[in-house]
Amino acid sequence: MKRLVVFTLSLLLVAGIAYAKDYEVKKKAGEYDVEARIDKNPPVVGDNNIEIKIKDTSGKHVTDAKVVVEYSMPAMPGMPAMNYKTDTELKGNEYKAKMNLSMSGSWNIAVKITRVGKTSSMKFTVDAR
């Protein structure tokens, strides 16, 4: 009986780790509430899908903006800074893009939202593994 309990608990622990929640950040970008989700937590070296939801001051989804994701790793001894940019595609109420993090370490991410000629940005940092 004791073995069965230990086995069941181990199985639940492994299942919980395998079903990890997305990496999620909620911040303000100017007048907008922005939620960014990366499909891997923690983000990994290689392709990572990012989904961005933007709401205006009245709580309505913003679907008429141009959204660009810029991601960079600062320079290190013997290595220049790495700077990348990817455009997003609107699908439903979410802007979606793919980021390719080329190495492990700390990455700075900026979500730039341009709407009616005005640009706002939300910045956060992730640690790719």
Annotate the PLM regions.
Residues 19-129:
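Contiguous segments within soluble domain cores/interaction surfaces
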